[in-house]
UniProtKB/Swiss-Prot annotation:
Keywords: Cytoplasm, Ribosome biogenesis. GO terms for molecular function: ribosomal small subunit binding. This is Ribosome-binding factor A. Monomer. Binds 30S ribosomal subunits, but not 50S ribosomal subunits or 70S ribosomes. InterPro entries: KH_dom-like_a/b, RbfA, RbfA_dom_sf, Ribosome-bd_factorA_CS. It is found in: Cytoplasm. Belongs to the RbfA family. It comes from Kosmotoga olearia (strain ATCC BAA-1733 / DSM 21960 / TBF 19.5.1). It holds the Pfam family RBFA.
Amino acid sequence: MSAGYRKAMLESEIQKVLTEALRNFKGESEIDPTLVSIVRIELSKDKRYANIFVSYLGNDEEKKKAVEFMEENKGYFRTAVAKNIRLFKAPELRFHEDIGIEASLRISKILEEIKKQEQEKEENE
């Protein structure tokens, strides 16, 4: 089994565990934890750090609150990872807002505008 394959499998397992932990979260929060999505996880080579990219259904302020919620409860989530995945040491979790969806929408809008401009140029010529 190659190291890259193992890393990908661990990232996938961590994502599953965190999603389950979000679903079972019982604490107080300003946001609805069931609307938080774990989009992707990037595990460091030494498996000591996990960058977790989070998305939330809501406006920008609510998205920031979702990341803050995850940061405030990182001990709960790290414990869930430690209990469910056999690792020598559970990775330190670092939560980030995922901007992939917004970026792809912005790029598609720009491409549509370019296409319209090219069509207008062709019509004018």
